[in-house]
Amino acid sequence: MRCHPALPPPVPVLELAGLSRHFGHVTALADVSLQLAAGQVTALLGDNGAGKSTLISMVSGVTPPSAGEIRLDGRPVRFASPADARRAGIATVFQNLSLVEDRSIAENLFLGCEPVRFGFVLDRRRMNREAEAVLERLKVNLPPATTAVRYLSGGQRQAVAVARTVLHGSRLVIMDEPTAALGVRETARVLDLIRELRRQGTAVLLVSHNMDNVFEVADRALILRLGRKIADLDIARTSRAEIVGLVVGSASTRATAQERAA
């Protein structure tokens, strides 16, 4: 019987190594390291002021790190702007979604990169065709791509924002409180969308305070407290009580998590 050497683990889509951010004498994030894998949903959790927004702003190119390194496919990268991060395949869907109310679904998907014919004529037919295709790929049921966004529900708007990231080939999608202010049915649709992103091999970083949502779709939970990463948990091996204890700073819960990690 021939023995084959074990294959090396796949290179993570995104890796943060010792990332820190200082604002004057205030340390917003301190020595945070993490890895995000393709086809995996990672929940980023923490109380207000834990450092979640700072971490997202650095990964999405809004704020440069004070120290540490961001690696994409194992290679160090530096983002001078959000456009740099988007070109590298990192998309962030913020709570405001950045959609234009009076533009159609298709126009919002192609916002800023509209295809043209003859060098100057907007190719609306192509926009509508490709918009319908990407929505079908995501198994999203929406009105026709010519429909203005103002007529869409909250969950449908979230779907348009996510579809835009897929259309532009994003390999990592950061979702900031995607179900905030949504009803039960709309929340279920957004969670289905996250599952579909995972199925298609996209890495998803989910920022949420909703533990039900986290336990429904996440594979891992990264927990920040006072700017530091204090836990990296397998969702299948943890509980709501443990996560809440870590978020609020329970010493006994933190000790248990550290013992298990060791």
Residues of each region from the PLM?
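Glycine-rich phosphate-binding loops of nucleotide-dependent enzymes
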Residues: R2-A262
